Amino acid sequence: MRVTDELVLFWGANDVYSNFYYFPFVHQGIRFIWSEQAVMYRKAKLFGADAIASKILKANSPKECKVLGRSRQIPFDEEVWVKNRERIYKEVLREKFSYARTENAILSTGDRLFAEASPFDKIWGIGLAEDHPDAENPDKWRGLNLLGKVLTEIREEIKSGRGGNGLG
């Protein structure tokens, strides 16, 4: 993770803002280990792929969750996913960042913009590594940075008193 005056550039399992970060939390009454697991579970359920959703709950890593979430056994519809993906991410991450430790972490970023500095992800990330010369210039990002936008929205909700529950 790299923090500048204006950005929080993150990517990888060691960064609390990453969906691969180990942080058990409860979402919709189910205990998840990583937010990636919760998102992929919700994705599978959205498309009625209950068998895949069950496998996601038993996964041993966030990478395994991601692979299962992309399974051809899910009757995926791009239009349906695009309509629902940001809402699902926001609902999941709102829960993850409702615990005191994660809430404090997200609030500690001030007003900086979150940027998932994944060189591989052009939807949820910026499409650039954190050490890329253009990583600090949002106009030059190659990705949509949807994860960064969702995290920024959640932080603003918490700051305005509309989010968080102060749990452990």
Regions found by a protein language model. Give the residues of each.
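Charged, low-complexity intrinsically disordered segments
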Residues: 1-168
